[in-house]
């Protein structure tokens, strides 16, 4: 599980009191939340990504990288070696698509995508929401950089083969 933490304590309390989580739909998530509220109280209060192993919630890994300094929409690759995520729009109207190599803790910028003018002029938010395909070679994103909202499929097969040779 990947967790973005700003101020986790309040969020954990809110989630623990949510009757939806009381059902046995997400027992692993509830286990981590309960464990976290007791054991991570003062450990994850920074703007960073954290990995929590559902089988060993006490094993908390903070992803230390200057490019992973804001909330996004992360997803772990099918082989569990990479994380794809996006950033929110910066002051110039660009969002980044980022690939984290979990083995080397290195981040690659796959691309930067400009928010469509009509969205920025109306102060509307828009995110890339990157998702892996089953092979781990393709990324699907939502983007407005061509002037309208569209879905795009990006092949990262060549980048992955270069990373694996390093």
List where the protein language model places each region.
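C-terminal structural cap/anchor segments
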Residues: 49, 53-102
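Beta-strand C-termini and the immediately following turn/loop, strongest in propeller blades
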Residues: 3-10, 36-43, 84-91, 140-146
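Conserved blade-ending motifs and adjacent loop-strand segments that build the rim/top face
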Residues: 61-75, 105-132
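Surface-exposed loop/turn elements that mediate protein-protein interactions on large endomembrane-trafficking
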Residues: 17-27, 46-64, 99-112, 158-162
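Blade-level signature of beta-propeller repeat domains, shared across WD40, Kelch, NHL, RCC1
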Residues: 124-166
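Blade-terminus and WD-like Trp-Asp/Gly-His loop motifs, strongest in beta-propeller folds
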Residues: 1-4, 73-83, 90, 129-138
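Structural motif
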Residues: 10-18, 44-51, 92-98, 147-155
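Membrane-proximal basic amphipathic "stem/tether" segments
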Residues: 8-45
């Amino acid at each position: 599980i990947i967790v973005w933490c700003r101020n986790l304590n309040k969020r954990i309390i809110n989630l623990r009191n949510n009757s939806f989580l009381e059902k046995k739909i997400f027992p692993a998530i509830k286990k981590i939340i309960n464990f976290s509220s007791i054991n991570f109280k003062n450990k994850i209060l920074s703007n960073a990504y954290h990995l929590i192993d559902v089988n060993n919630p006490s094993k908390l890994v903070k992803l230390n990288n200057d490019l992973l300094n804001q909330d996004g929409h992360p997803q772990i690759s099918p082989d569990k070696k990479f994380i794809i995520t996006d950033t929110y729009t910066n002051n110039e109207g660009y969002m980044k698509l980022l690939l984290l190599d979990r083995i080397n803790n290195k981040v690659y910028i796959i691309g930067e995508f400009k928010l469509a003018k009509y969205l920025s002029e109306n102060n509307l938010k828009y995110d890339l929401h990157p998702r892996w395909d089953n092979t781990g070679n393709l990324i699907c994103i939502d983007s407005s950089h061509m002037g309208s909202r569209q879905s795009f499929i990006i092949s990262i097969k060549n980048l992955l083969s270069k990373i694996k040779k390093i």
